[in-house]
Amino acid sequence: MLDSLVSKLPSLSTSDHASVVALNLFVALLCACIVLGHLLEENRWMNESITALLIGLGTGVTILLISKGKSSHLLVFSEDLFFIYLLPPIIFNAGFQVKKKQFFRNFVTIMLFGAVGTIISCTIISLGVTQFFKKLDIGTFDLGDYLAIGAIFAATDSVCTLQVLNQDETPLLYSLVFGEGVVNDATSVVVFNAIQSFDLTHLNHEAAFHLLGNFLYLFLLSTLLGAATGLISAYVIKKLYFGRHSTDREVALMMLMAYLSYMLAELFDLSGILTVFFCGIVMSHYTWHNVTESSRITTKHTFATLSFLAETFIFLYVGMDALDIDKWRSVSDTPGTSIAVSSILMGLVMVGRAAFVFPLSFLSNLAKKNQSEKINFNMQVVIWWSGLMRGAVSMALAYNKFTRAGHTDVRGNAIMITSTITVCLFSTVVFGMLTKPLISYLLPHQNATTSMLSDDNTPKSIHIPLLDQDSFIEPSGNHNVPRPDSIRGFLTRPTRTVHYYWRQFDDSFMRPVFGGRGFVPFVPGSPTERNPPDLSKA
């Protein structure tokens, strides 16, 4: 059967039937990834990302052998497919599920790592390739190419580490790795686009400041656009109260507004990653509380499922695309050069990562008075390690820069594409497989005291895992009475922090307009909704 399927691949671009066959096989592979990923969940070396990648590699080898070297993949890679359809649900769900208190408590450190650190890493990689590539015969690259390579390989993929870390045992570390990963992706894409749009043939101090100003402009406006879209969705749902007639409308509106935020950012040439991430944070803080109970459950699982499928799709495809015969044919005459380029890039990634993680961690610790909030050396090693893996963002940016309509006719471009694939595969598989043992060694399981401070220790967390401990809705309807299990957290932190003043502003001005915690929709006749008027009469 597989022979007949693969035999149809050469005519994939011209035959609708062949496209359907390829899609069927790809969906079957996605199912296999999910099943095997579940079975290998407790494995010391494997995780779902590596499983999908290896299945993609195995499938690529099989197709390559059966098609006698004509093809290794089912679908043609498209950066539009990645940036428009696959990336938005992943980033939005990251913002929607984020532990907001931990994220904003460590916001300065996250921005140091995610924004400043990414620029440092990009600079070091760019300087390194400028020096090393000139000694290798790989083609003619200009300053813009070297800077673009720096931006491409500054984009991290911390999925493997996040799948291993326990955010209840190490909330600080998880928050830093998670937050930095999102900001890093956004920064890399913004820097890459800024480099692409600037004429770097006459680079001077004025142009450098202009480039920095453009970066800050994109960063700020993208964040504001995401927050504004989230607030609009909260206001509309709160005022019109769709759930009174249909929870389907609530769910549909939340999904469409989330996607609209990303597309608006692309329309205005902003950073869609930052926009949809902060839209997710705002919607989880306001909009999610304004919908009915059934809509809350549905949206939570829908966004998580879409994100999971998109991630699996990406790793599966990267595995298959790694064996694309057309890309490797261009560099087959000089395999040593391709290996040297890949090794140089991998070394620069490691050096560039270390160049900012340890110094910025030191600076961050200087500003922290509480010992529990400081980043110890073992945590710094984990943060450094989590950013060594490269994934789909690097692949997509490399395709954008070094291919034309999916083809790599220029030898230098082909070398960069194959080197990017090699770095992504090596870092994801090798570093990813070593992640569990490394974290087990550096971070032995914490005792119960750390989990007491986590957000999900009550049965209520089964239904509402998105919120932190001070964001749960009280069953009695009295939202001013503090919960008993939050007293410990209250006593162990300063009472006049930025978070304190934000809560004052939020409770006084934002929530009365946009809803949020405390706004409890009630659908007459629905026994599943919270706080019905009088359950005894039901």
From Swiss-Prot:
Residues 41-45, 128-146, 193-216, 284-302, 364-378, 435-538 are vacuolar. GO terms for molecular function: calmodulin binding; sodium:proton antiporter activity. Residues 496-518 are annotated as: Interaction with CML18/CAM15. Keywords: Antiport, Calmodulin-binding, Endoplasmic reticulum, Glycoprotein, Golgi apparatus, Ion transport, Membrane, Potassium, Potassium transport, Sodium, Sodium transport, Transmembrane, Transmembrane helix, Transport, Vacuole. The chain crosses the membrane at residues 20-40, 46-66, 107-127, 217-237, 263-283, 303-323, 343-363, 379-399, 414-434. This is Sodium/hydrogen exchanger 1. It comes from the Eukaryota. Coiled coil: none annotated. It comes from Arabidopsis thaliana (Mouse-ear cress). Residues 74-94, 147-166, 172-192 dip into the membrane without crossing it. Acts in low affinity electroneutral exchange of protons for cations such as Na(+) or K(+) across membranes. Can also exchange Li(+) and Cs(+) with a lower affinity. Involved in vacuolar ion compartmentalization necessary for cell volume regulation and cytoplasmic Na(+) detoxification. Required during leaves expansion, probably to stimulate epidermal cell expansion. Confers competence to grow in high salinity conditions. The lineage of its organism: Eukaryota, Viridiplantae, Streptophyta, Embryophyta, Tracheophyta. Residues 1-19, 67-73, 95-106, 238-262, 324-342, 400-413 are cytoplasmic. Glycans are attached at N290, N370, N447. Belongs to the monovalent cation:proton antiporter 1 (CPA1) transporter (TC 2.A.36) family. Transgenic plants of agricultural interest (e.g. cotton, Brassica napus) that overexpress NHX1 have enhanced capability to grow on high saline soils. Inhibition of Na(+) transport activity but not of K(+) transport activity is mediated by binding with CML18/CAM15. Inhibited by the diuretic compound amiloride and its analogs ethylisopropyl-amiloride (EIPA), 5-(N-ethyl-N-isopropyl)amiloride (MIA), and benzamil. Also down-regulated by quinine. It is found in: Vacuole membrane; Endoplasmic reticulum membrane; Golgi apparatus membrane. It catalyses: Na(+)(in) + H(+)(out) = Na(+)(out) + H(+)(in); K(+)(in) + H(+)(out) = K(+)(out) + H(+)(in). Ubiquitous, with higher levels around vascular tissues and guard cells. GO terms for biological process: leaf development; potassium ion homeostasis; potassium ion transport; regulation of pH; regulation of stomatal closure; response to salt stress. GO terms for cellular component: endoplasmic reticulum membrane; Golgi membrane; plant-type vacuole; plasma membrane; plastid; vacuolar membrane; vacuole. Calcium and pH-dependent interaction with CML18/CAM15 (increases when pH decreases, better at pH 5.5 than at pH 7.5). Induction: Induced by NaCl, KCl and sorbitol in a ABA-dependent but SOS signaling-independent manner. Also induced by abscisic acid (ABA). It is a multi-pass membrane protein.
